[in-house]
Amino acid sequence: MVFAHRMDNSKPHLIIPTLLVPLQNRSCTETATPLPSQYLMELSEEHSWMSNQTDLHYVLKPGEVATASIFFGILWLFSIFGNSLVCLVIHRSRRTQSTTNYFVVSMACADLLISVASTPFVLLQFTTGRWTLGSATCKVVRYFQYLTPGVQIYVLLSICIDRFYTIVYPLSFKVSREKAKKMIAASWVFDAGFVTPVLFFYGSNWDSHCNYFLPSSWEGTAYTVIHFLVGFVIPSVLIILFYQKVIKYIWRIGTDGRTVRRTMNIVPRTKVKTIKMFLILNLLFLLSWLPFHVAQLWHPHEQDYKKSSLVFTAITWISFSSSASKPTLYSIYNANFRRGMKETFCMSSMKCYRSNAYTITTSSRMAKKNYVGISEIPSMAKTITKDSIYDSFDREAKEKKLAWPINSNPPNTFV
């Protein structure tokens, strides 16, 4: 190695190390003619850099943008309107206020959260082909995308535990409203802390990109595996085991262990219908969020930005369909929910039976707790004597109303 000296009048000598060159190439580097191979290498590097930049800024066709916007828009409207309606009906209707419905409201709030804080931004990134909202927004969007499914799966596990003890061991353990609130709060607090590392793994390294998947480093891989086990596999296995025991108990209720027909079952049919509804709900949820967890385990390299964007958008649409399908499932399997909607929007012929049917007395309060209804009795079906109480007080006996108790034990389930 030799050293070349550069003289300057205003500065001290600067010693620059240079490599030995062959004797036939002793000319100055500024005047030396580069080889053709060097030009080819520089051109290839420039081409690869430009191709990477074009992958990061793709342009979708108008048809692709319209299709994605329509599908996401329909699901978004169903999710916002349906889950808001679930919260409103359970809040206003007395017939739907129960312990199980606390869990239902918690899931509806989680669906509203992902509908507002995550899904619109994913659609915006897909349609524009870049991320323009900064690194902090990228972290928050991905955080809520991990938070909501974890909260919901643990709330579904809480519902499963509630159904198990209500049907199999009704006298040994009961999930009261206070216990339900504590279980819901524990689900939110635990998962909020569990998905905190997402804030460190995600972020916008440059202004126009927000990573879709966790990094392929050993830290990212380790967290992905732990999140898949704790946030999906273990709760799913527990849910399956609990519902398996519940189904066995429903079909095998004899003291001697013999199998009986469902018509001889001591379990009320309303609770059997509730189990069916929650089984379908759990199945839809697990199938909807399974592709999301599998894609995170796969750790695809985001070299082709358009391809990874298409994959992630499809996965987001599948998982988001679970949020939009829950209110539809409630309205199909839940007669009380349908009646609650009628009471909420005053669509019933008996507009607000609780406010117009009774005076404020002790007996009226007891009647409200026992779900008293009102029936119209036609005048042709009654025989009233001349000296009856109606004639004494000059009351017309054309349309008199009779109150009767519908159910002495109001249901404590969602159905």
Curated annotation (Swiss-Prot):
Pfam families linked to this entry: 7tm_1
Side of membrane Cytoplasmic, spans: 91-102, 162-182, 243-277, 326-415
Keywords associated with the record: Cell membrane, Disulfide bond, G-protein coupled receptor, Glycoprotein, Membrane, Receptor, Transducer, Transmembrane, Transmembrane helix
One CC-aspect GO term: neuron projection
Entry's transmembrane regions: 70-90, 103-123, 144-161, 183-203, 222-242, 278-298, 310-325
Extracellular compartment residues: 1-69, 124-143, 204-221, 299-309
Keyword Membrane recorded: yes
Annotated glycan sites: N25, N52
Membrane topology note: Multi-pass membrane protein
Disulphide bonds in the chain: C138-C210
Subcellular location: Cell membrane
Organism superkingdom: Eukaryota
GO molecular function annotations of the record: G protein-coupled receptor activity
Main location, first listed in the record: membrane
PROSITE patterns in alphabetical order: G_PROTEIN_RECEP_F1_2 (PS50262)
Tissue: Abundant expression in the brain.
BP terms from Gene Ontology: G protein-coupled receptor signaling pathway
Matching PANTHER family: LEUCOKININ RECEPTOR (PTHR45695:SF9), LEUCOKININ RECEPTOR-RELATED (PTHR45695)
Biological role stated in the UniProt entry: G-protein coupled receptor that plays a role in the regulation of circadian rhythms and energy metabolism. Participates in maintaining proper circadian gene expression in the suprachiasmatic nucleus (SCN), the locus of the master circadian clock in the brain. May function as a coordinator of aging-associated metabolic dysfunction, stress response, DNA integrity management, and eventual senescence. Upon binding to adropin, modulates mitochondrial energy metabolism via the p44/42-PDK4 signaling pathway, influencing pyruvate dehydrogenase activity.
Family, as annotated: Belongs to the G-protein coupled receptor 1 family.
Protein name (Swiss-Prot/TrEMBL): Probable G-protein coupled receptor 19
Organism per entry: Homo sapiens
